[in-house]
Amino acid sequence: MITRIDYCNSVLYGLSVITLAPLQRVLHAAVRLVANLGYRDLLTPAMKELHWLSIAYRIKSKLCHIMHAAVNNRSPAYITDTLVPASCLLHRERLRSHESGGFEVPRVWTEFGRRAFSIAGPTVWNELPHNIRTTDNVTTSQ
């Protein structure tokens, strides 16, 4: 079941911390409610105990889940068609890092363009360690 705070949060990738602050405050209020904390109590230990991520990490996690589905052929064609594996690059353009199951990140000139899934997905995916990228199990990659 997708929680309301996670619904469509991958479209929020690339937004500033200031823009995400109201959503983060909602998450903090939920932690205080669930963990029965006061206003001055620390939230980080409670979030770790609840296994909750901050909004920025939730967004990256959602992108990684979508990319994992695309890599393992469990996503729609409109998602997989936007991704270019690094192995498709010309031989002279290949780097050692591209041999490890990464994706080509197309060149983009605007900040708005960096938020597109065809850019954000491969960027987040290529930042993951190799052992997480190559796993077939979603729960292992979490």
Question: What are these regions, as identified by a protein language model?
Answer:
Residues 1-142:
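Hydrophobic/basic alpha-helical segments
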